[in-house]
């Protein structure tokens, strides 16, 4: 069954994810004039650069929407963000700086909650502003059809008639002006920005060039810590978790997770914490580049992983990291609610996050520069007396115990020595000149 419509379905209800910007404003008016019954849906994701959400539905009505709804997605977004922290669902990193998958998390929430709202209104055709080269077109496609199996997709930016008539920002602005709307294009930035309560993404235009870096970005969730005139003072922060849930910051307990995240963003943002520059593979395997902000996610992630390493054993931590890499990629691909992702999430939340209770004290400085000052938890398995260099009573083990443990190592040491001898005899390994160390041999071909 065809789910993607190449032309505008005239006379039918069409839902559009409406941001109030130039693109969706022009698209809504154009679809209305061409005969579609337009329904506008706006997701309140707590975007830090959006000042008046209530104005957006009113604007949609003025452009010809039969109905316009504002859907509050903030609580669900924070819920998914915390789940990502609990399961370590982050697969993109460079030099220790992590991208916290904030855009994929936002798409998972938007794609399900807006389509659910459309379904309530009997709207089974959905349009949004994603382009065919990006990740979002596939993410929204998957989440939309998961939520409404009868959904059909109409995207103005895949409709050749729309492209021919309104193919650029100048054409769209002129179209709105010609129809009596005093729409002035905002000044062109050197890059594009997309944001939600969890984080911000800066990409495209000048940022497609790798010789343009973070210094051309004007942060919307933090401070430009790289500038000499940007004053950033060290700050001590205490983060508390209970059974994997962040519950308190600097002694203030939060019952509303959205309020907690807003405060975490404010704290981390004062230092530029969580900003990073990444080259990544899009879903279609072509590489793209983005500069990201996520001050609250970064703060909570640091504290969570500090408790994690003090509470769980090595094998559990290793499995958490392996599963997190896989889960992060599934999230990025728009598969956050697929069964394989739910399995990995539930495993981490049940067996890892449930034990994460305690407080972490940090000193934040500039950017991602911080120090861990204290870690407290009733569940810590870190017990310094076990390995103390001082003489202790009731030692966990004795010199004789260690002799026995080392003697058992002779079994695998003997096996390894035998293998190295075999590799040397076949020429795979050669002894390095002047040293008793093995090196890989050259191809004998």
From Swiss-Prot:
L-aspartate binds at residues 131, 135-136. Pfam families: Arginosuc_syn_C, Arginosuc_synth. CDD domains: ASS. Its EC number is 6.3.4.5. Gene3D superfamilies: 1.10.287.400, Argininosuccinate synthetase, chain A, domain 2 (3.90.1260.10), HUPs (3.40.50.620). ATP binds at residues 17-25, 43, 129, 131, 136, 194. InterPro entries: Arg_succ_synth_type2_subfam, Arginosuc_syn_C, Arginosuc_syn_N, Arginosuc_synth, Arginosuc_synth_CS, Arginosuc_synth_type_1_subfam, AS_cat/multimer_dom_body, AS_multimer_C_tail. It catalyses: L-citrulline + L-aspartate + ATP = 2-(N(omega)-L-arginino)succinate + AMP + diphosphate + H(+). Pathway: Amino-acid biosynthesis; L-arginine biosynthesis; L-arginine from L-ornithine and carbamoyl phosphate: step 2/3. GO terms for cellular component: cytoplasm. It comes from the Bacteria. L-citrulline binds at residues 99, 135, 139, 192, 201, 203, 280. Keywords: Amino-acid biosynthesis, Arginine biosynthesis, ATP-binding, Cytoplasm, Ligase, Nucleotide-binding. One of its GO terms (molecular function) is ATP binding. Belongs to the argininosuccinate synthase family. Type 2 subfamily. This is Argininosuccinate synthase. The gene is argG.
